[in-house]
């Protein structure tokens, strides 16, 4: 046996007991509201096209696939859950493992627990209120505040993110000592994300959760564009005590528009030298068949448990981090 083997869990046992209590509380929250718990696959023949997400890939070589079938570990259960919604399942939630081949650190582990739920007939604001209710129940925190993406930039960086050009964004980046990154970045949305991460996030959600809504339309992902202001998407995120907790959408239901967005993502991936990803045609077929008007959100459970315990790192709240797996 290796003398360097680390068999012990990364989280203390009392923390795992608290984690179990949080998971039970989450399930109780949705059961009390009549939301169905579902399970969907951890692997799929298609994956996300988002240029900022990196999935794990494997190959199935079982019966009927001697040449190998490419499969991807799911970065979230979103696509399968939307197929259930299109089939008429009604409001649903899921607690599941998700996988991202990205960073590892205080707030990240390649394998993590996701809470995702969808509400037919909910707009973005009604879902924000439900996320707020859940956080108050689980974390016993104050009611959240809400700021638009534009308001957050204007308050903390004194710039309008919806109208500023790349030169103006680089000027703000210089004030944050980020010129070494910003000066060579040509993608406007990447510049905005850099400024948001370094110049806005540290100042929000300190005493109570903060919802940021109406992200730029160019960052819509799978969200609808606002009918009142076509510059913004009906997308929101929530932050608390320096941690991003959730990302939600008033979901796009137009299959043609969704295909165009996937294709645009793949063009961006090609321009950056990243592999183009297979588009999920099953999802597009579900949208074509009729996804009900709905809003949905994905929330990082491990991070919620961190906040419930006052933990400093994700390793304190999961049994085995990847370096001990």
Curated annotation (Swiss-Prot):
Chain positions recorded as substrate binding sites: 76-78, 118, 251
UniProt KW Nucleotide-binding keyword: yes
A Pfam short name: tRNA-synt_2
GO BP term, pick one: lysyl-tRNA aminoacylation
Record's subunit section: Homodimer.
EC number: 6.3.2.-
PANTHER family per record: ELONGATION FACTOR P--(R)-BETA-LYSINE LIGASE (PTHR42918:SF6), LYSYL-TRNA SYNTHETASE (PTHR42918)
Recorded GO MF terms: acid-ammonia (or amide) ligase activity; ATP binding; lysine-tRNA ligase activity; tRNA binding
Keyword flag Cell cycle: no
Gene3D superfamilies registered for this protein in UniProt: Bira Bifunctional Protein, Domain 2 (3.30.930.10)
Function, as annotated: With EpmB is involved in the beta-lysylation step of the post-translational modification of translation elongation factor P (EF-P). Catalyzes the ATP-dependent activation of (R)-beta-lysine produced by EpmB, forming a lysyl-adenylate, from which the beta-lysyl moiety is then transferred to the epsilon-amino group of a conserved specific lysine residue in EF-P.
Organism the protein comes from: Klebsiella pneumoniae subsp. pneumoniae (strain ATCC 700721 / MGH 78578)
CC annotations in GO: cytosol
Alphabetically ordered keywords of this record: ATP-binding, Ligase, Nucleotide-binding
Family: Belongs to the class-II aminoacyl-tRNA synthetase family. EpmA subfamily.
Reactions the enzyme catalyzes: D-beta-lysine + L-lysyl-[protein] + ATP = N(6)-((3R)-3,6-diaminohexanoyl)-L-lysyl-[protein] + AMP + diphosphate + H(+)
Protein name: Elongation factor P--(R)-beta-lysine ligase
Residue numbers binding ATP: 100-102, 109, 244-245, 300
SUPFAM superfamilies registered for this protein in UniProt: Class II aaRS and biotin synthetases (SSF55681)
